[in-house]
């Protein structure tokens, strides 16, 4: 099964999206947006930037866990991954975002 985006509204009326893999696991979480239209633009940005290796910023947290940020051409963070125990599992996460990030399916939960 292919991946999809889920768009939601927080209790303080901000918007965020997540990218889900075909197995339902969240593989990328966006920042908060003040409008639904801005969140939808963020989804479009994931679609255009996720296939490009150079858009992934690989990081190590202070606790030694690995994660990545997906960035737009202007270097703004579009979304961040979960924390991974190993650098290899982070690479698997990046591959999953590349494979699912061009999905046209959006489940609107707002």
UniProtKB/Swiss-Prot annotation:
SUPFAM superfamilies: YegP-like. This is UPF0339 protein YegP. Pfam families: DUF1508 (PF07411). Keywords: Repeat. Belongs to the UPF0339 family. Duplicated subfamily. It comes from Escherichia coli O157:H7. Gene3D superfamilies: 2.30.29.80. It comes from the Bacteria. The keyword Cytoplasm does not apply. Sequence repeats lie at residues 10-58, 61-109.
């Amino acid at each position: 099964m292919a991946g999809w985006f889920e768009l939601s509204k927080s209790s303080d009326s901000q918007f965020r999206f997540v990218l889900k893999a075909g197995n339902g696991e969240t593989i990328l979480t966006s920042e908060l947006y003040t409008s639904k239209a801005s969140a939808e633009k963020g989804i479009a940005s994931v679609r255009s930037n996720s296939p490009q290796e150079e858009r992934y910023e690989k990081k190590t947290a202070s606790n030694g866990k690995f994660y990545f940020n997906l960035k737009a051409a202007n270097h703004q963070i579009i979304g961040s991954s979960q924390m991974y125990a190993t650098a290899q599992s982070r690479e698997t996460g990046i591959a999953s975002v590349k494979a699912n990030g061009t999905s046209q399916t959006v489940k609107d939960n707002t």
